[in-house]
Amino acid sequence: AQEIQEQKDELIMLLDSVKAANANTVYFQVRGRCDAMYKSSYEPWSSDLVATRGMDPGYDPLLFAVEEAHKRGIEIHAWFNPYRYESVLHQWDGTPQNYRESHPEWLLDYSDGSILNPAMPEVRDHITAIIQEVVQNYDIDGVVFDDYFYMSGTTDDMDDELYQQSNPDNLSRADWRRQNVNKLIAQVYRMIQSEKPYVRFGISPAGVWCTDATIAERYGVTPTPVGSDWAYDDIFCDPMAWIQEHSIDYISPQIYWTIGSSSDYTLIAEWWSQIVRQFGCHFYSSHSASDLSSAKMPSKYGKTTTGTLSFDLNGEKVSSKALSPIERKTAEENEYIVDGATASFKGSELVNQIKVNRTYDETGAPGSVFYNMRKVTHTSGMLSLLRSDVYKYPALIPAISWKATSDPGLVSNIAFTNGQL
């Protein structure tokens, strides 16, 4: 009971901090590795929540998060990793609802983990059903996917049989894999529209789409001006397809570089702003509070030997080993600092990035996303800086103007007392 209350108290503290910063939405991770931070009919309780995967925590964290967030006028988007299963092979052996026992054919194994196979219709149906249960049973405001699709290093032999059997359009293997991901995203979007069309669906992919002019020409767009094609070529992620097919409501690319770096934040943010205006979609730039280091600073830091990158964030040393695949990739593509050295960044970098977003978006930029909340709330002075500069006033959730909605009617049950609405 004490641990439950401690978890609830910590979440309330975080939500109060979000409210104090005049932010309006929280992405609450509900499924990290085919597990659940809510009462699921399909998958076990998450080991990030309890000591042993599958152990009942004694309460429903998602239900609690939704109730407390809504009390504060904050939206909750349920954050899913659609495919990721294990961070280490056979990690869940001996635990409840183990797919290695029930559906071993669903898994693609890599040296550093496993995922559900995006090529299998049964997998797409299963993931959609998992998300549908959350949409039906919880008063969430949105659904968001993280940056995990295929894992890097998918060899031909891993899916050759399916490629030969289920490729009626005779696509290249890479295009076929991207199509598999696109099918899931379109299927989830259709499900949400049929259940609760007001629930927003977004994805947070890598910050760079594709720099290949030939591929960009297929979509009638310009290529991303800087960066590499790692996400498009290696993990088979094609955000342009989702935007053009209108199978998402918003895109939140992880632009984890600083202004003036070799992959300049300004250039990438401007490009995404142009893309969403062209096709009709919201752009909520994802900013990294955990990975803004000298690895992404201008080249005055110089290149050095490889090694573990570390940086100092207001006195807290953070290792690159703790970063997500996209965070690690962005670090690899930029200038490293020497082993053991540290660098720091100021909150003003995030403020300036928000101002860049507003400069290039004709509506003042619908929004920004910060990864992760703890870094923002626990960095001394960060919340007050945001509130004193770019978030002086509370903001409404941006309207999705391209979707038909019913007239909500006149507002009722509202009062203004002592300066509070």
Question: Where are the regions that the model predicts?
Answer:
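Aromatic-lined carbohydrate-binding/catalytic grooves of carbohydrate-active enzymes
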Residues: A21-P57, Y250
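Substrate-binding cleft of secreted/luminal carbohydrate-active enzymes
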Residues: T25, F236-S262, W272-A404
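Structural preference for beta-strand elements that scaffold enzyme active sites
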Residues: T25-Y27, G73-W79, G113, D141-V144, ...
